[in-house]
Swiss-Prot record:
Record's function text: Splits dipeptides with a prolyl residue in the C-terminal position.
Signal sequence extent: none
Chain positions recorded as Mn(2+) 1 binding sites: 255, 335, 380, 419
Catalytic class of the enzyme: hydrolase
A GO-annotated cellular component: cytosol
Alphabetized CDD domains for the sequence: Prolidase
EC number(s) reported in the record: 3.4.13.9
UniProt cofactor(s): Mn(2+)
Biological process, per Gene Ontology: proteolysis
Domain of life of the native organism: Bacteria
Transmembrane segments: none
Protein name listed in UniProt: Xaa-Pro dipeptidase
Family classification: Belongs to the peptidase M24B family. Bacterial-type prolidase subfamily.
């Protein structure tokens, strides 16, 4: 933890620098960042699981306590208004005593609706950052999530501090242990539900602590890109396993995918080819490279796989140009990663929020940035047998280029995705996922 504390000092200094710059530019007194409030289920007395505002948890790892506030201006010591009610029904969070607390002036809030007493006396020139705009209006904020401030913060959030990079390494390290446990469970005959339980046990995190709903897909379920059903019964025949699952560390996410074949066969060979292609794409990452160019290169590699494995005929570039590869690889190559799984800033050209749209032929690409040092991105090429997309090819002449017999052979396996989390450095790439032990 001392290593992390050392980096945290510089992290807070950088966040203060960013705030000082944007509030000066926008003639604001400062920012008031709301952790959020509980959301009550309809006609019930139970709340949905609480998720802290990512702008709040960028400053400190308070992840599960609603009704907290940060008051920052980039000059004075940041103030943390920490919610600690008198409550015999629920567990009350302890007053924080960690390495980061020395960087904050901490005030305790016992009643959520009394926060105005602890906020700056004249709030009119402070900007509110958070979800609950109705609360901000009642409190007197006239500036609520201003575009100029949000665009500035989102643009710079793509450049990670050393503290953030270390948190993400640890999130990867935790997730790798879960992936190894899940792989072992698959080969030992576990159901989707049982694999999920073994994953969560290995990472030591619950359903609401991991950064997103895990995808645990056996056989043809792997063709459903965001499959989260978790069947309790095993399939009649065990063919394949796709796992897309991450872990959290101090609010930062990992996002890792692997695909396995139960036996040595054509599908297993296709996984090997995809793994090789993915590593080649990662080798192409460097500062100055346009991420959309990497995505287009992925389509070229998918096209070659379609030819090599007799899924399609023709030439590779023609398969890309006709949109045939998009039927087999319909999603983007990856995205920014950080406080959020699909982290902000992936389309930002500059601090003003100038939008770089995805290519018209690839609307699901989640990042169009030019790569720069200290960015963290996922690299997740895939190839799937998705009938709804392949049926579109049957409607025109493109269907004549598809070897439907091979498609039928591979359909029960669902699909393949391989995803690593990569830090772009000035002179190298750091593949956290591989370097921390997941082949």
């Amino acid at each position: 933890m001392d290593h992390l504390a050392h980096h945290y000092h510089a992290h807070i200094a950088e966040l203060n620098r960013r705030v000082a710059e944007i509030v000066s530019r926008e003639a604001l007194s400062g920012l008031v960042i709301h952790s959020g409030q509980p959301h009550r289920m309809f006609l019930d007395d139970i709340n949905y699981p609480f998720k802290a505002n990512p702008h709040f948890k960028a400053w400190l790892p308070v992840l599960d306590n609603p009704n907290c506030w940060l008051v920052v201006n980039g000059r004075d010591k940041p103030q943390l208004i920490f919610y600690r009610p008198v409550d015999f029904w629920h567990k009350v969070s302890d007053v924080p005593e960690m390495f980061w607390t020395e960087h904050f002036e901490i005030k305790l809030l016992t009643k959520a609706d009394k926060v105005a007493e602890l906020l700056p006396s004249d709030i009119t020139n402070w900007a509110y950052l958070g979800e609950h705009l109705d609360v901000a209006e009642v409190l007197g904020f006239t500036s609520r999530n201003p575009d100029s401030v949000m665009s500035y913060l989102h643009f710079h959030r793509t450049t990670k501090t050393e503290y953030e990079l270390e948190c993400m390494r640890r999130a990867n390290q935790i997730a790798v242990q879960g992936h190894l446990a899940a792989k072992n469970a698959f080969y030992n005959g576990a159901s989707e539900f049982e694999i999920q339980q073994q994953y969560l046990s290995a990472v030591g995190q619950g359903d609401n602590e991991v950064p997103y709903g895990n995808i645990i897909a056996l056989n043809q379920n792997a063709a459903i890109l965001h499959y989260t059903a978790l069947e309790h019964q095993n399939p009649a025949r065990r063919l394949s396993f796709l796992i897309d699952a991450g872990a959290s560390y101090f609010g930062y996410a990992s996002d890792i995918t692997r695909t396995y074949a139960f036996e040595k066969n054509r599908f297993d060979e296709l996984i090997t080819a995809m793994n090789k292609a993915q590593l080649e794409l990662i080798d192409m990452m460097r500062p100055g490279v346009r991420y959309p160019d990497l995505h287009l290169a992925t389509h070229g590699k998918v096209a070659q796989m379609l030819l090599d494995f007799e899924l399609a005929t023709g030439d590779a570039q023609g398969l890309v140009d006709q949109g045939i590869t998009s039927a087999f690889f319909p999603h983007g190559l990856g995205h920014m990663l950080g406080l959020q799984v699909h982290d902000v800033g992936g389309f930002s050209f500059d601090e003003r929020g100038t939008h770089i749209p995805a290519p018209e032929a690839h609307p699901f690409l989640r990042c169009t940035r030019i790569l720069a040092p200290n960015q963290v991105l996922t690299m997740e090429p895939g190839l799937y047998i998705i009938d709804t997309l392949l049926n579109e090819l049957k409607q025109d002449s493109r269907g004549q280029q598809i070897n439907w017999r091979t498609v039928d052979e591979l359909r029960p396996f669902g699909g393949i995705r391989i995803e690593d989390n990569v830090i772009v450095h000035q002179d190298r790439n750091e593949n956290m996922t591989r370097e921390l032990g997941l082949a």
